[in-house]
Amino acid sequence: MDKTKRPLRKSKRSFRRRLPPPIGSGDRIDYRNMSLISRFISEQGKILSRRVNRLTLKQQRLITIAIKQARILSSLPFLNNEKQFERPESIPKTAGPSIRNK
């Protein structure tokens, strides 16, 4: 095929605009900074990955340590699953005294 008859190929790579870093230079990664830590936790209470967070390896390690410290000190729950504790409304409650066998 001649060079003149070749079809033009578009590049397959798309350009993505660079987003600002999620952690500013003034932000301290600490277990007491709940507003910062809560941005890196999913709705279920799981720690989000580096790809999702757009953090460096060092920042991700510090965030993980801070989240684990906050969980141990009960500042942050281990699980965030409200559906587990909700009682279904379709089950009727039994009326009357309960009988125990001794």
Curated annotation (Swiss-Prot):
One of its GO terms (biological process) is translation. The gene is rps18. InterPro entries: Ribosomal_bS18 (IPR001648), Ribosomal_bS18_CS (IPR018275), Ribosomal_bS18_sf (IPR036870). This is Small ribosomal subunit protein bS18c. SUPFAM superfamilies: Ribosomal protein S18. PROSITE patterns: RIBOSOMAL_S18 (PS00057). GO terms for cellular component: chloroplast; mitochondrial small ribosomal subunit. Residues 1-19 have a biased composition (Basic residues). Belongs to the bacterial ribosomal protein bS18 family. Residues 1-26 are annotated as: Disordered. It is found in: Plastid, Chloroplast. Its main location: plastid. Keywords: Chloroplast, Plastid, Ribonucleoprotein, Ribosomal protein, RNA-binding, rRNA-binding. GO terms for molecular function: small ribosomal subunit rRNA binding; structural constituent of ribosome. Part of the 30S ribosomal subunit. NCBIfam families: S18.
